[in-house]
UniProtKB/Swiss-Prot annotation:
Superkingdom of the source species: Bacteria
Lineage, highest ranks first: Bacteria, Pseudomonadati, Acidobacteriota, Terriglobia, Bryobacterales
Binding site for NAD(+): 274-288
Binding positions for FAD per the UniProt entry: 14-19, 126, 182, 371
Job description of the protein: NAD-binding protein involved in the addition of a carboxymethylaminomethyl (cmnm) group at the wobble position (U34) of certain tRNAs, forming tRNA-cmnm(5)s(2)U34.
Primary location: cytoplasm
GO cellular component, one term: cytosol
Cofactor(s), by name: FAD
Organism: Solibacter usitatus (strain Ellin6076)
Cell compartment(s), UniProt: Cytoplasm
Keyword tRNA processing (UniProt): yes
The protein's name: tRNA uridine 5-carboxymethylaminomethyl modification enzyme MnmG
Length: 604
């Protein structure tokens, strides 16, 4: 007798940053979840830089944490240098960043995942998705012939779909350097009638720290008082390290310019579009010929390794050129290259094939998250994995979907940008993408999103109790400032809320929750601007409440040009607000559409 395959509620394909969040979310909510990866030892591998967070990216990590995700907690537990960025500017753009011990990050993430009773992690290659008679996903087929039936499948394959690496003139198929690509699944997905593209990313060489003259570089220390990512973290206790700053030279320029004909980026060998905001070092010298030098950062990859990541020197140049390029930098003349840099091309879907839940519009039960959707970055991948996991769980449980609006979080901005505008190049989050960034701060991510995580069943009792305590303290302290002379003093730019700490402890009767003082201070000093943004957000929410019916026909609407009809028909926006964000759709066209909806569909 042939044994029946074990059935799961959800199968997650891939165990990168998106896959880990998706799998853990589904399992934590109570779904039987299988996460399938081609290498169990590389769960949550940091394929590129050994860091979490950064400008806007730190906001995403806080939002992952506020919802009940895992990235922030793991990062806090293995971080080896923490810095709060942009502190010379306003609190809207403050953002935490931390260097990670890459090996410990993998180990800790695997430990967290294996502690989930509803989650099973399997080492295998998924060769294909399986479908029922009405083209709904109902599981996966493994390369060894086994099947795993499931109610939903979340694909988080990163750069593995038909991945092709480039080092100079040399090319080879891989998902990451030294790892096999996912060609069978990639070929099946490309045959399913969806729109795909090729994107490209790259990574720099790694050096042996013992061969570096560290005295030639400027040391960069972390903050004396580290800022954690997770609202659950008290203090960062782990040993902290230094990074170092250096610069390219005229010799670096000469080496690269002479080798440009050998660059796969400029020879036509690489066809995929690379990230605009993280260009390769050769691209920097070509596109910015007047810039005298470019900054690099030497970042240790861990506490028990000599391997050093050269941030700012991503390249796909031939290995001999990379050796000469490294040696052209003061302090690296004798540096030994452990691993060369390389570029990798991979398949990515046009994210306009998805809806706000990250489910493929035309294939029920199939969700996509991470680099497969055209994004770059661990943090962008992590939040997508969490959203896909939450929505797969909600769908299987018959609950309403989890939709985060543009006024509620950077998570909502990321998803809305992807499914409305597409991704012609790897998408990276910036604070400038937010209409209301003073409202979307790192200190209030819990106030914005923890109630949503609680309703979805993801936020734990511990997180919920801490959040409620902070909200009670905030109400009490805000009222106290409003009725005391200290309230007027606090509004002054030069006055710090920490000056009132003894009085605050007296008012609260206990020590304030972490982050509370930052929130109260910001809302006092920027109250007028925040109120103005709240009025603007209310208007945006009104436009989001004007729903456009599923399958709505744009053809034949008087006053809408054929071009705009085509754009709207391709994206299929769900609301009038989303329609207004479709590239090329004018305010006049939105007014016409609003009028037509009112006349023919009725008031919202």
């Amino acid at each position: 007798m042939v044994a029946m395959p074990e059935r799961y509620d959800v199968v997650v394909i891939g165990a990168g940053h998106a896959g880990c969040e998706a799998a853990r979310a589904c399992a934590r909510i109570g779904l039987r979840t299988a996460m399938v990866t081609m290498n169990l030892d590389l769960i949550a591998q940091m394929s590129c830089n050994p860091a979490i967070g950064g400008i806007a990216k730190g906001h995403l990590v806080r939002e992952i944490d506020a919802l009940g995700g895992v990235m922030g907690e793991v990062a806090d537990s293995v971080g080896i240098q923490f810095r709060l960025l942009n502190t010379s500017r306003g609190p809207a753009v403050w953002s935490p960043r931390a260097q990670m011990d890459k090996k410990l990050y993998r180990f800790r993430m695997r430990e967290v995942l294996e502690a989930e009773p509803n989650l099973r992690i399997k080492q295998a290659e998924v060769a294909a998705l399986t479908f029922d008679a009405v083209r709904r996903v109902n599981g996966v087929l493994l390369r060894d012939g086994r099947t795993i039936p499931a109610g939903a499948v979340i694909v988080t394959t990163g750069t593995f779909l038909n991945g092709l690496a480039h080092v100079g003139e040399m090319t080879y198929s891989c998902g990451r350097n030294g790892e096999a690509p996912s060609q069978l699944l990639g070929d099946q997905l490309r045959s399913m009638g969806l729109n795909w593209t090729r994107l490209k990313t790259g990574t720099p060489p790694r050096l042996d720290g013992r061969s570096i003259d560290w005295s030639s570089f400027e040391p960069q220390a972390g903050d004396a008082e580290p800022t954690p990512f997770s609202f659950l973290t008290g203090r960062i206790e782990r040993q902290q390290i230094q990074c170092h700053i250096g610069y390219t030279t005229d010799e670096t320029r000469r080496v690269l310019q002479e080798a440009i004909p050998r660059s796969p980026l400029y020879s036509g060998q690489i066809e995929g579009v690379g990230p605009r905001y993280c260009p390769s070092i050769e691209d920097k010298f070509v596109k910015f010929p007047d810039k005298v030098r470019h900054q690099i950062f030497l970042e240790p990859e861990g506490l028990d390794t000599h391997e050093v990541y050269v941030n700012g020197m991503s390249t796909s140049m031939p290995t001999d050129v990379q050796v000469a390029m490294v040696a052209s930098i003061p302090g690296l003349e004798q540096a030994e290259m452990i691993r060369p840099g390389y570029a990798i091309e991979y398949d990515a879907i046009d994210p306009r094939e998805l809806n706000h839940t990250l489910e493929v519009k035309s294939i029920p039960g199939l969700y996509l998250a991470g680099q497969i959707n055209g994004t770059s970055g661990y943090e962008e991948a992590g939040i997508q994995g969490l959203i896909a996991g939450l929505n797969a769980a909600m769908s299987l449980g018959g609950s309403d979907p989890v939709i985060i609006g543009r006024t509620e979080g950077y998570a909502g901005i990321l998803v809305d940008d992807l499914i409305t505008k597409g991704a012609d190049e790897p998408y990276r989050m910036f604070t400038s993408r937010a209409e209301f960034r003073l409202h979307l701060r790192i200190d209030n991510a819990d106030a914005r999103l923890t109630p949503l995580g609680r309703r979805a069943g993801l936020a734990t009792d511990e997180r919920w109790e801490l959040f409620q305590r902070k909200e009670r303290q905030k109400l009490r302290l805000t009222q106290a400032f409003e009725t005391h002379k200290n309230g007027q003093l606090l509004k002054r730019p030069e006055v710090s809320i920490s000056d009132f700490l003894p009085w605050i402890v007296e008012v609260l009767g206990e020590a304030p929750c972490r982050g509370l003082l930052e929130t109260v201070s910001t809302e006092a000093k920027y109250g007028g601007y925040i109120q103005q943004q709240e009025r603007q957000m209310a208007r945006m929410k009104d436009s989001e409440r004007r729903a456009i019916p599923h399958g709505f026909e744009y053809r034949g609407i008087p006053g809408l040009s054929r071009e705009i009809q085509d754009k709207l028909d391709k994206v299929r926006p769900g609301t009038l607000g989303q329609a207004g964000r479709v590239p090329g759709v004018t305010p006049a066209a939105i007014a016409v559409l609003d009028c037509y909806l009112s006349l023919h569909i009725g008031p919202n």
